[in-house]
Amino acid sequence: IFWGSISQCAAQKIAVKTNLLYGTYASSPNLETEFGISPRGTVDLGAGFNWFTSAHSSSNNKLVHWLGSVEYRYWTCERFSGHFWGIHILGGQYNIAGHHLPLLFGDDSGHYRYEGWGIGGGISYGYHFLLGNRWSLEANIGIGYVRLHYDKFRCETCGEKTGTENRNYFGPTKAAVSLIFLIK
């Protein structure tokens, strides 16, 4: 049974997936499509967004954003099976308020609203677990660099702009536990 699963996996050319961590933490619908380009190489295209704000919040808490990414993956055995290494680029726009994100915006980040964009890239490592003929689970983590450019606003009223800033971020750029459907 195990050998049959591995041989079927080698024939896979396309995977459609959703990152369960990102979807849960950021309440963000997201979708990725991964294409086989060689026996050990794939390209993963991902997108996620959150256009929702809390209707019950008088403090204007929000995590509004869109994010896109492209990753080349090199599989150590064969694509869509086992270990892989990747190199990725990412970019997006955001409007964030009421969230304490010190790695991105500093220690006082929970007291301001940030509206801007970011672009970056990094390297990643992951492992693909076969669950059945068509279903899989994948764990992936990445580190890298992101350049952030944003306008900063006082969060109490979220109207008074206090300045425009740039920030260089080095650290985790990817964390995923993805549910995958394999297409032949």
Segment roles from a protein language model:
Residues 70-105:
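Helix-adjacent hinge/juxtasegments
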Residues 35-39, 74-80, 129-133, 183:
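Outer-membrane beta-barrel strand-turn architecture
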Residues 9-67, 177-184:
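Short glycine/proline- and aromatic-enriched beta-strand/turn motifs that initiate or cap beta-hairpins
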